[in-house]
Structures are given as C-alpha cells and as structure tokens.
From Swiss-Prot:
Belongs to the CarB family. GO terms for molecular function: ATP binding; carbamoyl-phosphate synthase (ammonia) activity; carbamoyl-phosphate synthase (glutamine-hydrolyzing) activity; metal ion binding. The keyword Magnesium applies. Mg(2+) 4 binds at residues 841, 843. Pathway: Amino-acid biosynthesis; L-arginine biosynthesis; carbamoyl phosphate from bicarbonate: step 1/1; Pyrimidine metabolism; UMP biosynthesis via de novo pathway; (S)-dihydroorotate from bicarbonate: step 1/3. Mn(2+) 2 binds at residues 299, 301. Mg(2+) 2 binds at residues 299, 301. This is Carbamoyl phosphate synthase large chain. It catalyses: hydrogencarbonate + L-glutamine + 2 ATP + H2O = carbamoyl phosphate + L-glutamate + 2 ADP + phosphate + 2 H(+). Keywords: Amino-acid biosynthesis, Arginine biosynthesis, ATP-binding, Ligase, Magnesium, Manganese, Metal-binding, Nucleotide-binding, Pyrimidine biosynthesis, Repeat. Residues 404-553 are annotated as: Oligomerization domain. Mn(2+) 4 binds at residues 841, 843. ATP 1 binds at residues 129, 169, 175-176, 208, 210, 215, 241-243, 285, 299.
Amino acid sequence: MPKRTDIKSILILGAGPIVIGQACEFDYSGAQACKALREEGYRVILVNSNPATIMTDPEMADATYIEPIHWEVVRKIIEKERPDAVLPTMGGQTALNCALELERQGVLEEFGVTMIGATADAIDKAEDRRRFDIAMKKIGLDTARSGIAHTMEEALAVAADVGFPCIIRPSFTMGGTGGGIAYNREEFEEICERGLDLSPTNELLIDESLIGWKEYEMEVVRDKNDNCIIVCSIENFDAMGIHTGDSITVAPAQTLTDKEYQIMRNASMAVLREIGVETGGSNVQFAVNPKNGRLIVIEMNPRVSRSSALASKATGFPIAKVAAKLAVGYTLDELMNDITGGRTPASFEPSIDYVVTKIPRFNFEKFAGANDRLTTQMKSVGEVMAIGRTQQESLQKALRGLEVGATGFDPKVSLDDPEALTKIRRELKDAGADRIWYIADAFRAGLSVDGVFNLTNIDRWFLVQIEELVRLEEKVAEVGITGLNADFLRQLKRKGFADARLAKLAGVREAEIRKLRDQYDLHPVYKRVDTCAAEFATDTAYMYSTYEDECEANPSIDRDKIMVLGGGPNRIGQGIEFDYCCVHASLALREDGYETIMVNCNPETVSTDYDTSDRLYFEPVTLEDVLEIVRIEKPKGVIVQYGGQTPLKLARALEAAGVPVIGTSPDAIDRAEDRERFQHAVDRLKLKQPANATVTAIEQAVEKAKEIGYPLVVRPSYVLGGRAMEIVYDEADLRRYFQTAVSVSNDAPVLLDRFLDDAVEVDVDAICDGEMVLIGGIMEHIEQAGVHSGDSACSLPAYTLSQEIQDVMRQQVQKLAFELQVRGLMNVQFAVKDNEVYLIEVNPRAARTVPFVSKATGVPLAKVAARVMAGKSLTEQGVTQEIIPPYYSVKEVVLPFNKFPGVDPLLGPEMRSTGEVMGVGRTFAEAFAKAQLGSNSTMKKQGRALLSVREGDKERVVDLAAKLLKQGFELDATHGTAIVLGEAGINPRLVNKVHEGRPHIQDRIKNGEYTYIINTTAGRRAIEDSRVIRRSALQYKVHYDTTLNGGFATTMALNADATEKVTSVQEMHAQIKKS
C-alpha cells in the first residue's frame, strides 16, 4: 500500500545531547529519516537540542528547532507548527520518553497529532517490564525470573525470591543507567537506592543472574502487512553480565548452529508481532545458557537503537531510512534497496560474506576514582567497527582502529613479573576495558583454552582464534624479518596483522615491513559491502580491505578526488563535532564537482553512511591503511584537519610518503603545536602570553616554578582534551604531579604556565585563505579560565566583553593566521584579565565549537573552509563578513558523572563532558535558561541556597548573595563565607562542614534542604575536603555550580522563561539577513 496521504507534516523528535549510552547513532538515524520523509514530499519539523548534529542543519528539515526535548517546549512547537504526526522512534530513549509524556499530558490529543512508527501502547508494552513478561509468556517464550519493585521493602522481597547474585535495572532509562549486579544484601540496597532515584517511574526490575550466559541480538524490521525480515544477527563476544554496549560484538553470529539460528529468528519475529511493532525496526536481545541451551528473551527496543546503527553499517541496509518510510504506510516489498541500485526490494534479507567486529572505546583515565570494571551499566564512550573476511582479520583491524596505542594483541604484562599470572587471572575474571589483551597474555603465559573459558565464559570458538594468533606472533618473533617469506607474510596479512605489529615482533621499523610487502607486491584488495554477498551488481562504493585476489574497488581515473580522513571512535575530547566537520567537507566538495572519499571506522556516525561521500572506505585510520587506499585512489588532496587528533597525528608521515595533504601544511601545524617554535612566532608578533616554561626534569620544574609563581597549569605537550593536565598550587603539589601523573623526558617535555586566576576565557573560530581572515565567531566562556574549554559553557556573542577587547582579539587572530600560514579553519583561545588580552593557544584545525558557531551565525564554516583548502578564496565564495547575530546562543555541556559514582564532579583542566546542547534567546539570560533545561539541569526558582566559596571569590560572593536574596532565596553559608557576608550586612544561617560536627552540610543535602549550591575551591586539600558537597549535590539532584561565574549566569537565568517562546533555526538565520 502506498504512503499515507492524510498526513502532510511530521514532527521528528531527536535524541538530544550525547551521553554515555546514547551517542551519535541517533544523529545518523534522524538525518536518514529527515531525508527519507522529505523525499516523499512531507513537510518535516525537527526538534533536537544538540547543535553538533547533521540533522539540525537548516537544510535537513523544513523547520528545525534547536530547543530542549522537554514536553512543555515540544508542546509549544506543536502549537506553532501544527504537525499531523509525530515520529518518536529515531531519537533513542529521550524521544520515546518525551512522546509518552506528550501522550500522558494530553498534548497529542489536544492538537490532533497521530503517533507514527510506534504506538504509545507498543512502547509501553516493550518498556514496562511487567507487561513485557506477560506478553512473552503468552507466546511461549521464557524470560528471566524476576520481580518489580517501587520501594526498598518491595525490592528486598523480590530478592528473597530471586536469590543472589541478581541483576537490577531501573525502568525507562538508557544504557543501563543506575543498574548493577548485587552479590550480597549490602550491595543490593546501595544499587536499589540509586536506581529508584534515577528511574523516571521509580521502578526497578530485579532479575535472576544470567551471568556467563551467551548473549545475542536480532535486528528485525516489520511492516503492517506482517512482512518481517532479519537484517542482521549479532553475537556478543563477552558473556552476559557486561552491558551489550560495553561488549565486543560480532556479526553475523558465529557460534549458533543453523537450527538454533532459525529458532531465534522465529522467536524474534513473534516478539515484534506480540508487542505490536508494525512499522519499523526493533532489536530483540536473547540469552542462551551454554550448559543446557535454555533460551530466554532479555528485552526488546521498539525503536532504532545503537545496535541498528551497527547492523546498518555492517550490512549496508539503511534501517532508519526504511523504518521512516514504513512509518508513513509503505510496505517492505514496495521499497527498493539503494545499495543494489534498486535491483532488489527491501524485503530481501541482507546476506553477508564477511565478518564484522565492534569493540567499545573507554575513557576511564579521565575519571580518577571511577570503578573501571564492566557491569550491566554502560560505561563506554564510543566504538570502532572493522570488516574482514575472517574473524581474526576483522578482530585485529578493530584493535588497531581503537587508537589506544595497540597495533594488535600487544602484551599488557611482562611475563617475567612474578605477579603476572595473578594479574592476568584477575583481569580475565573481573573484566575491565582491556580484557581482550589480557586473554592473549593468558595464552602467552601458558593457560589453556579451557582455563581461559572457565575464567571468562567467552565461547571457546573465539578463544581458539585468539590462541592461534598468539602462536603465530611467537613464530614471527622467532624467525625475525629474514624468515618472513612471501607465503608466510601473506598468511599473516590475511589474518589481519598490522605492519606495525609485525615490525615490533620482528624487531624492525614499520617502514621495513612495508618495503618487504612492496618487494613481494603484497597489497590488500578492496571488497564491497553490497547487502547481497555479490549476487547482484552494486552501484554503491562502500569498501573494506582484505588480502585476497580479486579487487572490486574500480577507482575512477578521470576525476579530481579529495579524501577526507575521519576521527575514528568517539571519545571524550574528540566526539561528534569532528564528524560533523568531516561530513560538511565531503558535502561541500561534492557540490563543487570533486569525487569525495571518506575513510573512517566509527559505525555510529553520519560520515560512514554510504551516501554521504562518493566512496566510503570503512577502515582503521592508521598510516598503513590510509597509504594503501591512497595507492589505489591517487587523490588530488587529503584533508587531515577535520577529524581531530586522529588524522593530525598522521600528517607528517603522510606528507613524507608523498601524499598531497591540503590546507594548512603539516609543518605549520607543528609550528602551532611545538612549544618552542610557537614561542618564536608569538615573540615576533609581540603578543602577550601567561609566563611559561618547558621543562624536561623535575628539579628544573621546581626552579622554573619559583620564577613564574604559583598557581601553575601543568601538562604534557601534544594532547587533546587536556589529558593529564592539572592546576598545582605549591611545590609539594608540583612534585606529586611529576611522580604520579607523567613520565617526563627530553622526548616528552612538560609545559608549565602561570595560571590566570579569575580570567575570562574566550574561544575564537576563524578561517584563513592566505589573503584574508574571516572571524567565524567570538565565544565568551561562562566558567573562568582553568576549566577546560570543552567543559565550559559559552555565549555567542560575548555577554560581558567590551567592543575594544574583542577588536584586540580580532587583530591578534589575523596576525596569527598569516604568521602560521593557515589555510582553512583555526581556533584561538584567549584569556582576559584586568583588561589585558593573553594568548593561551592556537589550533590550526577544526575545533569542537565549529558546529555551534555555524548554527548560531548561519555560516557553514566547515564547508567554507573545505572549499578554501581546495583552492577557492573567501572572496570567490562571497563569505567575507563576520556575522554577529541579533540574538544570544549559549552552548552548555553534558557531563557523565552519574555513571561514575566515585568521581569528584569538580570542573578542571581535564575535559570530561560527553556532549553539548544549545539554547537561543533574545537575551543572554533566556538563552542560558534554555541551555540549562536542554542539559536536564533542574533549576528551582526559589528555596534555600548554600554558599561555600574559596578565598579569591569572597569579594564577589556578596553581590551574588544579594541577588539570590532578591530572588527570594534563603541563604546558608559555611564559616568563612558567612563572616564575609555578615560584614556586608547579609546574615546567612551558619552550617558545619563535614568535619565540624553534625548536623553538617551532607546531612542537610540528604534531608532535601537545598535547591541550589555554590561551592568553589582552590588547593588540593580544600578540593579533597569539599568533594563530599559536590558528590552529594549530584546524588540528590540539587542544582550546583563550582564556579562563581556559573553562579552569576544561573541567577540571571532564574527570571527567564525557557519554555515560553520557540524559534526555528530558519527563523533565526532570517533575522540575521534582516539585520
């Protein structure tokens, strides 16, 4: 049946900011849905608070709202735009929860809006654990023994029935948030208390433990005529007990017999029928007991999910696009498969002739004190996917694509260490982020496959594969480079060994292995992902490498090509913002007639969508892999400055190998990154910098620190996201940093900078084409200097800086761009103190603020800069004027502290945010209030506020206290702060710090006395002492600020109404044109 004609306009709900458990796979699905529905002639309205997404680009929908995904705000959008239907299955758990709330509040009924893609009843039946259990029993499928609890008493009663260990999961949360495994009553009570708090319905599901069972997922698509297809089966390499988002997964499933696969296939279709999903994709998760084969259904998601993004990339079947078309009434047999050029209908189940491996990427090093063991609560921040012809090839490609310093199965422990075996056994039994490497170490240390299986419950089939790779490594180490004859080397390359890994084993440089391959003429061929195992011809160039005979790449000979290197797996400090820039580069250069080639290995992103570029190579972004693609494609230019640190690290080596790197030269990049060379440029331009020094030994550091003066910012050179960066307050602190945080040497110097306390930090994005400099935007940070720029909220235009100061910055940016010979994007960070401008750093590449600035000003900076790199000047493009919008845009960050209970949520020079939201308003206050609502912070307009500030903030705190009083707050203060306020005639209630006797601050927070807390600290001792305030505020959901500037911004926003007015991006940009 063709599409519905009773619907003219559709509202798509996005997923909001990137958090652990809900990443950019929903930008990928949302962008596909927008395209698919507009193709069919529908008017598309989109709401998503995350500016770093492709789907919020003004050309993706007819009306785009970068507004909080909150039912009251969405109600305003519905009232204004009057859509006929709402599609909630593209924006993850956020969108589903929002849609259910709109239904509950009667908004959909009030404005006559139909829900498409899923019914409220189907969502509820899948998400409500009790209804789901009943539904499964009805169709004869088994579920885990479980019970539901809404209070601690109920929970304990369920535990008595289910027994220990048991698994606790809160309802309606994402990525297992708040859940865990309890082995005893004490752990059980702790997890339940947290879970009840985090579930929006205060509901817990308590299950019997399935730890050690095998876990599988089926990606299913079903239409209203009951056509049902399995897009892909996915097997978890790690057994149950580790969240599927944190498990290594493999597609298609490797260890099922055909009979078991058919049983699971039929069961998953039965689940969709029973739940009532009839227009879209779902994923169904199963567990199998390896001892007796008992099969149970764990859960199903009635929406597009993380796994469906993986399944789409693994098979080439665009699940989100198909689901969007099914939602408006099409059936599978009416839709054509794009990848085969319409030679097959969408009702054909994809078949694949390769193996796909996904490995999660973790960032525990950012969270001191976090529990880094893997459990049922998701903790990974990104993932990498690799494709190979065998399990071994695909696994080894994924390992090197992860960018954690491994080129394959690099050893984690030295076997000479007497503790080695103990450590290996511990790591296998209680999995952390690196377990896969410890498995290889276990085989090196002489454990048998059975021995490893007993510790890990990982299927023996997978273990045998790894054991074989370890034995081959031993052979390479034994024979050395002279023993690598053509046949042996080909065998190793077929099993996925990287040149760099073989070089390490043979004790030579990587270049020597490459030379050897050239001698043997041993190079990879490229195979296509075509959904049909090469049964039909394909027009889509979606490729992966493998060492076989026949190459299917067929590169064009007569076209100018530009290759864009992507950013690899998401991680903190390098996220979706960089992917956004890569996509824009590809789109702009395609429009200009170039053939574009994308190289990336992140399955969640839009850049790895088969129709974003002309040609897609799904490969690790490493020197070896990139050089092999260049060998075949011979591009005219390669762009390295858009994918963050990943491709930048390769710039010099690529240039040395004769690859045409376009844009800012690798040498110029080095001039900005290398401290000494940069210093020369700054001196020549006579710019001011905070006093600084570069040191290569601890005693030298102590001497230099005396000259510069404390406090100091200390960090290793060449880092992204502020890794191992700290503020130190005295010599003892400095010595501790050198002993614990870094290994310093001539090759790895450490930088010392005078820390400008209380300075205002500013970010400037600009583009230079060699003749002129375009200022993209000047952003004033809300948190003062010392908080990593990626963790600070910021405002465009600036909300306190004078015009003169901004002009000084404009001139300095221009001088720097010419001095460093920038071609393309650059980002400069300044600090302003006592009306003086200090230069902090320059990055001659795309910065993470580019998408935000583009949305705020309407200038697509990444596209403009890509054209500059390809040789088109700013004047030719007609983009020469800095745009200062007639409204305020505020970017606010989203932090993952709720996933890491042991971590202090104090902001500092290490970046820890996972995502961002944007708020727009006529005043700074309104924009800031919207950004707060978008980032889910719970701001109360009145109540009792607690003030506890450091020495340096005591002058300004009086002004803040007066503002809070005027707003109607009652005030509490700790001793030192209370004295200062008392002198100014404000008399707060005095409260005890934790070590001053009870009732103390923590008691009062627990009793719910506060609606707002401001706590600023300086100095290691004070930070340790006050950590309990910040953790308690987070745990009991009290809005808190850890900087005074944040406090002032918050008080300004208290009087603004974040839900009163909604403005689309298209309307915003029209206002700019008028002004």
